[in-house]
Amino acid sequence: MKLIAGPASKELGERIARLLNVKTAPIFFKTFPDGESYVRFDVESLKDEDVVIVQTTSPPQDQRLIQLLLMADNASDMKAKSITAVVPYFAYARQDKRFLTGEAFSVKTVVKLLENCGVSRIITVNAHNPEVLNTFKISIEDLSAVALLAEYFKNEGLVENPLSLSLGKKALSMATEANSILKGGFDYISTRRDAITGDVALEEKKLAVRNRDVIIFDDIISSGGTMAKAVEFSKERGARKVYAACVHPLLMGDSQKKIMEHGAEGIIGTDSVFSPVSKVSIAPLISKALAKKEQKSG
């Protein structure tokens, strides 16, 4: 196995390599003054190698996606036997269908680009809609980091018998998965999204949060608006401590400040995206999936 740590996931790639007891392949990146990306593998050949490229595609997602495509196509040109793209945060996954007539089916386009660049397998983490990934021909494995987040809360002693909440009923599986470790019960905060503006409103729903510690789980925190509303919603109903937990802490703009000002005790995320709140590493999760595949092919 040859592991290539892309510029967006250098630290994560190196952590995965250490767990797998492999070295990362030397690689050189630069950005030209006009913004174009340059990639060079400092190896003579990748012939007959199983290549793993680790590159998250968080903002600036277009640049990071292009870098990923350049790396994959380059590995293909250098005769790699197989190419696995580890894309912890999968850009454009939220555009998982045509909500309005004439819209691009963005996630399908991204998957096609990766396929055309020689990628035979994709590993991602808590994709926004994992069901849509199963409709593509290419092998896509969606891992869940929720248990790692729950274990962090349990081991750090940040909360006592917490209620695990998801943002929206569709994401209830996140709360149930967390509750399998935290054991304090689970529920969801009811949400409604405007198809045109994308704005999310919270709907009135009874929640047993009074005098309880609460952890609100979501796959992504981007602008932080919905999470801030959810934290405030819980605090107004008597929750004692409220934590925000997410797999992909994009934390655009003043989102972190916004969530804290609405009453959060703290924000905990993973290193799928490097951020000030990335306290939990997904390296063990990914290395386990890669090792399992290696054993099967071996």
Explain the meaning of each model-derived region:
Residues 1-298:
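PRPP-associated nucleotide enzymes
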